[in-house]
Amino acid sequence: MTLNLNSSLAGLSLLSGTNSFSLFSGGTPAFETLAVRRAKAAFTTPDTTPPWKQAGQAGSLSSQVSAIRRLSSIVDAGPITSRKLPDDVSSAFTTYRALDRLRALAEAAVSGPTASVRETLQGVFAEGLQDLETFVASSPRDKLSLAFDQPSSTVRSVAIKPESTVGTIAGKGVAEARDAPLLKLSGTERFAITIKRGDASDTISVDLSGGPQPPTLDSISSSINDAIAAVPLRGPDGSVNLDENGNPVPRWLVRFLPDKSTGSWGFKIENPGLEEVSIDQVDAPDALMVVTGLTDPDSPASTQVMRISDPAGTAERSTLSQIAGLDRLATERAELNAPKYAPIEGVEKPSLERFATTSAQSVVTAADGSSFVVGTTAGDLDANRVAGSQDLFLTKLDSEGKVVWQRALGASGSASGAAVALGPDGHVVVAGTVEGSFDGANTDGDMLVARFDAEGAELSSTLIRAVGKDTANALAVSADGSIFVGGRGATGGGDAFIARLDADGSLRERRRIDSGGSDTVNALAIGSNGELLALTSEGGVGTLRRIDSASLVNDLGSIELGQVDARALAVASDGTIGIGGSASSAVDGNQVNATGGGRDGFVARVSADLTSSDVSYIATGADDRVDSITFMNGNIYAGGRTSGDLSGTRRGTSDGFVARIDAGTGAIADIQQFGLATRNTEPVRIAAATGGSTVLGALGLKRGRLDDTDSSLLTAQTSLRAGDQFAIKVNDGVARRIIIDADETLATLSEKVSRITGTKATITSPSGDDGRTLSIAAKSGHTIELIGGGEGRDALSKLGLPAARLVAPPPFDKSAPKVVPGGSYGLDLTHALEISTREGAALALGRVKSAISMTQTAYRSLYWDTGKASIVNGGAAGTGGASPRQLAQIANYQDALARISSLTAGFNSGGFF
């Protein structure tokens, strides 16, 4: 018998005594189907040895950490790129090495001996996350795409509030029924309603005493609407226009209607003519607006907004609102650490929001009852994302304490707010200090003056450049709009400094005051004759100076108060000057009452010509100080803090107080003390709200314009500044830059992005509960890369957009292989990960290890393996599988081969080799 030993079916069995078909247990063949061969052909990446399989000693953990800290960045692609690896492999290896360094830092923090060591490691870890995100977003690629968080084809910006509402204005709900008596109204109130369109306006009086009693929403609505309808429309000659029935045609179409759209009954103002509608109560008592901070050992400071209604009468204090910057990363951290459990019906989950330190430094109230608060926050306010360590903020509140809008300076380094004032043109002026990067310049600590319009759009910002670290403390605006800013300069060991700017913010003049010691300007004001008043500390001596506002070098007089800490300054309508502060000994001047023996708060009344002063003490014998003062209708009001008992028993570690002092005699009329157990009260800032104790809040309304006016500019609603930028790369093409303009809106920015992305992405502005967002969505088969604008000028972070690569898979092709090399993989990382605590480090370590595993998976996706073959053949990964027809063919081959093998068994047993 002749045997064909070259047969492809029998060859292996003749040589080895076995056959290849016996390797297929469970009917799984070890040969490549046509589908496998087609899919495998796409896997062309050259073989490489990944870092995690390379031989070498990593060294001890401490030596690894030391080496990492010496690196300029944890992302070090040099050794990898020098090997000329394929782009996908190079990116995967670089990402792995960076993650491995983050792992070492996290492991060291878990076992770190002290909190200070972990804090040091946290700085390196946070910077490493940032560097890794930047690298991953723009890493070289061919078939493999990595994402810092999760792969996505779409991103959305922070929400931008829509422009001011028009047509209909909804008030706050205040009653359960429209005809229910409004108990907070006496029925004798009088209102002035002003309706304006262009140059035309009318102020309409409404007296509730002539209507039904007690007042209800229905009765007040009728009174207001009847009064508005009684104003006739007149022709050019002054004659009254009549309708077809001979009745006068109303000039205005505004109507106040009871409405329940907010859940309870209030007012809805229908305004089909789009007029500007304002309201105020006539002859209402005065009020004080109070802003202060409360801190405790377990939480950062936030700003509380309060109002004292009728402070010369009933003096009713109420808390209206709070200003607190959101700590975005701490909030996300809390969400990461929160226990996971199913919702329980009727039980509300605790809030996971975490807040950053937010402190107010100054407040001013306008004639319409709105207030402006300036200060410093380390968190986000609405769509204003803090870009550096902290930022200056400006918040507008309506007469009821509701936030109308919030603004941040947008400094990429550090900025702090110091003072706020109103200009004669209605503009808002703020002063502060900026350190680090700002508007493309690096500052070492410079004073800044910024101007805003009534809608919160920035009009100008002026840095007062000087060598060394200067600090702004004070601000004043004169009747002609001239702006004065004061504080402490760095020269001479610390000199008092004053600068004058014109009404448009241009710097015109500087002056330094050097007593030979440590000097500073603590407060500024405009005197009754237009002169500049500067309250200074000169070598520890409190001094009030009168300075020529047209030429700062000319002193017009001065008065010394002694060794005091004088910080507050105000001017009465008759020219009397008020000074507030603290002192540990008697203040120079006529003594109205006795000192307390400790550090005492004081208020000094100084004559306009600086020839005399009278001093009143607010003292307990403990620690007392006055932070702010204001004049209003024959009284001086002082806001401050005490660690003693001024008007009742102290509640907190330190309490706040507001004192009323007779402006003529200096006698202390009354004091309100307030605080919370275990809490420390921050400086108390007050502002006079003349006529501010109205009943409008009881009607769900507010003083002034009833529609909230807010700028639609991105440079107003976000922390973006003109000149900030980012770039877009489409399908690995050339990066094209987008620069933010001063008048940028969501619409104009969307248009800029659309011009670059063209048909490769969908750009929309979807609307949500918080406003509209910028949405960028890569279209199928295309890649959109978002690139940050660089240090100090990055627009992406301020828009809430990541530096990322948006990848949209190509359309599904039924004829394409089931498995292709590469793909999109997410590292599932976040900047909320931190290693400053052992708990946080343990969580971060787990996430980094998962990211390492994902990077290894991404690398393996570039190479063919049996698992991929199984998927192509229709089985689950790693299980194999063949079609029934293929299995039947294999069974026949195995049967034939078995018979051949039995005939040739002797070749092997006989020592064929």
Question: Can you say where each PLM-predicted feature lies in the sequence?
Answer:
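Amphipathic alpha-helical polymerization modules
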Residues: 1-152, 215, 219, 234-241, ...
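Short, flexible helix-adjacent loops and helix caps
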Residues: 107-114, 382, 799-802
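Polar/charged heptad-repeat coiled-coil helices used as signal-transmission/dimerization stalks
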Residues: 156, 163-167
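A eukaryotic intrinsically disordered, low-complexity regulatory tract that is acidic and Ser/Pro-rich
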Residues: 169-173, 269
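Short amphipathic, basic-aromatic surface patches that mediate peripheral association
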Residues: 178
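Extended alpha-helical or coil "stalk/linker/tether" regions that are enriched in polar/charged
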Residues: 681-716, 722-727, 734, 741-742, ...
